[in-house]
Design a protein with these regions (language model features):
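Glycine-rich phosphate/pyrophosphate-handling loop used in enzymes and phosphotransfer proteins
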Residues: 1-271
Length: 271
C-alpha cells in the first residue's frame, strides 16, 4: 500500500511540474515558464567551476591482493558546479526529489557545453550511475538517468549517420540504463572515501540487454548528478572497461565536491 501511495505521489508531482508555468525550482519565485529565476541563476553562476575538466584517480590500498601489481586507470571527468554552494545544493536536492524534465533539459544543455566534441557524436554512449534502491523506493525515478537521457537526446538532434548507406538512420549518440547495483551494500552517505570505494567495488554490473545496443560504443560518458569521492564513477568505469575494452570512458556530473571531510582530502584525488 505504501508503494502505491508513493507512486501516486510521484505521478502527481510530475503532472504538477509539467503543467505548472510559474515558479523557480530553487526558491519558488514566479518566473516565465518555470525557469530558474535571475537571483538563483546569479548564485549558480558564482558556483561555476573555472576549470570544468579534471582527472580522477585513486591509488589502491596497500595489501589489496585483488589489485596487486595493477595500476588503476585515471578517469577524465567534467563537472559544471562546485557542490559547496547553497544554490547548487538546493538544485541537486530538487533534482533528487522531482522528475522535472524542463529543468533537466536546461541543465543537460549546460553539461553538453563543457564536453569535448569527441563525447558528443560518433557512437557515444551515455550511461547513468544507478540510484540506490532506497532512493528509487522513496522517489520513484533516477535523477542521473534523467540527466543522461536528456543530454543524449539533445546531442542526437544535431544529426544521425546512415548505417551501410541505407535510409535507416542510426543514432550517433545513445542513452542506455546499462548499470545495476547488487544488493546488501551500505549507505554511501555515512561512509568515508576508502569505505565508499570498498562498498562500490564489485557491486556494479552490466545488465544483459547491452547486446541490443545499436553499435559498439567508441566513447562512453558516465553521468551522475554529483561526484563526491569519485568511488561510484571509478567503479562504473572499471565495470564498463571489462565489457567495452576499446571504448574511451569519461565521467560527467552537474557538480563536484571540491572539499570533503574524509580520510584523504579530495584535492589529492583530483589531480
Amino acid at each position: 500500500m505504501h508503494s502505491v501511495r508513493r507512486l501516486a505521489s510521484v505521478f502527481a508531482d510530475a503532472v504538477r511540474i509539467y503543467y505548472d508555468d510559474g515558479g523557480c525550482p530553487l526558491c519558488g519565485r514566479e518566473t516565465s515558464g518555470g525557469h530558474i529565476c535571475t537571483g538563483c541563476e546569479t548564485a549558480l553562476d558564482a558556483a561555476r567551476l573555472p576549470e570544468n575538466a579534471f582527472v580522477l584517480r585513486r591509488q589502491h590500498e596497500s595489501g589489496d591482493i585483488r589489485n596487486a601489481g595493477k595500476e588503476p586507470e585515471p578517469l577524465d571527468c567534467f563537472s559544471f558546479y562546485a557542490y559547496e554552494s547553497d544554490a547548487v545544493r538546493k538544485l541537486l536536492f530538487y533534482l533528487k526529489k522531482y522528475p522535472d524534465r524542463r529543468t533537466a533539459k536546461e541543465l543537460a544543455a549546460r553539461l553538453c557545453e563543457i564536453l569535448p566534441d569527441s563525447r558528443k557524436a560518433d557512437r557515444t554512449l551515455y550511461v547513468n550511475i544507478p540510484r540506490s534502491a532506497a532512493g528509487m523506493r522513496k522517489y520513484g525515478f533516477d535523477q542521473a538517468a534523467l540527466l543522461a537521457s536528456t543530454a543524449a537526446r539533445l546531442l542526437d538532434r544535431s544529426g544521425t549517420w546512415a548505417k551501410g548507406g541505407t535510409k535507416a538512420a542510426v543514432p550517433a549518440v545513445y542513452f542506455a540504463d546499462l548499470l545495476a547495483v547488487r544488493p546488501f551494500g551500505k549507505v554511501q552517505k555515512a561512509l568515508t572515501a576508502r569505505e565508499r570505494a570498498a562498498n562500490k567495488s564489485g557491486r556494479l554490473y552490466v545488465r544483459p540487454f547491452f547486446r541490443h545496443l545499436p553499435w559498439v560504443p567508441r566513447h562512453i560518458v558516465i553521468t551522475d548528478d554529483v561526484i563526491t569521492t569519485g568511488s561510484s564513477v571509478l567503479a562504473a568505469a572499471e565495470t564498463l572497461r571489462g565489457y567495452f575494452p576499446n571504448a574511451e570512458i569519461s565521467a560527467l556530473s552537474l557538480a563536484v565536491v571540491t572539499r570533503f571531510r574524509f580520510d584523504e582530502p579530495l584535492e589529492d584525488l583530483l589531480n
